[in-house]
Regions:
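Flexible, glycine/proline-enriched loop segments at strand-loop-helix junctions
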Residues: 36-43, 89-95, 113-118, 160-161
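A conserved mid-domain beta-alpha-beta active-site/ligand-binding segment of alpha/beta enzyme cores
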Residues: 108, 113-121, 131
């Protein structure tokens, strides 16, 4: 476990792992998985990951897991899917970060947009190369830090140099500029995250996670004993 001396968003964090791994195993496939997600079907999740690892391991490919949207959500980024590449993999046309409500509604209606789950697969070499191309100053810093890994100098080097990294997400640093090359050139592929995904980052998401076909018509979800509702709808009550 590498604990950052300070938060610099996702690009430096995952980038450092890539530069460290590249020194010993450049073809190692790295997975990025946020910790606040719920996966309802772990077996299907593992199947999708196995497919994604194969794609990420063959060439300079980046794999993103996309979730079929169920509402015009403005709190998630979106993936515009293009042509079918092979198997279940779709080529990615572009990424859009957290659109306004009108744009999100247009994406939902279009039918070829997916929520960006924030889960990615790529080889250490591919990610290190992408950072060097699109975020060269930060990549140079990360490479210097990685050079001292497994030495006594590493903790001091890490603390001294890491704050020099740009504070930027992997989406803005790599995915958006890379997708701008076009779906045939970017080598970014989307696999459908059809394994019961939910990001518990909002009350709406929490409500959806606990809702079932047997949920009451008023939309109230109640967890606990002795709880009664009056003239209330679409509430989540836990006591």
């Amino acid at each position: 476990v590498l604990a950052e001396p300070m938060g610099r968003n996702t690009a430096p964090a995952i980038g450092l792992a890539a530069f460290i791994l590249q020194r010993t195993n450049p073809e190692a496939v790295i997975g990025l998985f946020p910790s606040d997600h719920v996966i309802a079907n772990p077996d299907r999740f593992r199947e999708v990951l196995a497919d994604g690892i194969q794609i990420a391991a063959s060439g300079e490919n980046i794999v993103v897991l996309g979730v079929h949207p169920t509402r015009p959500e403005t709190g998630y980024g979106y993936i515009e899917a293009g042509s079918l590449a092979s198997g279940d993999a779709l080529r990615v046309r572009r990424f859009t970060e957290k659109p306004n409500a009108e744009t999100a509604a247009e994406f939902l209606k279009a039918g070829n947009y997916y929520w960006n789950s924030g889960m990615f697969l790529w080889s250490a070499r591919t990610l290190a190369g992408a950072l060097t191309e699109h975020l060269p100053k930060t990549a140079a810093v990360l490479e210097k830090i990685a050079a001292d890994y497994d030495t006594k100098k590493f903790p001091a080097t890490f603390r001294r140099l890491y704050p020099k990294c740009e504070n930027i997400s992997i989406d803005y640093a790599v995915l958006e500029p890379r997708s701008a090359k076009g779906e045939e050139e970017s080598n970014i592929f989307c696999l459908r995250a059809d394994f019961g995904w939910n990001d518990l980052g909002s009350w709406t998401a929490l409500h959806e996670h606990h809702a079932t076909k047997q949920s009451p018509a008023d939309g109230n979800l109640i967890s606990g004993q002795g709880i009664f509702t009056l003239n209330a709808s679409r509430n989540y009550v836990h006591a």
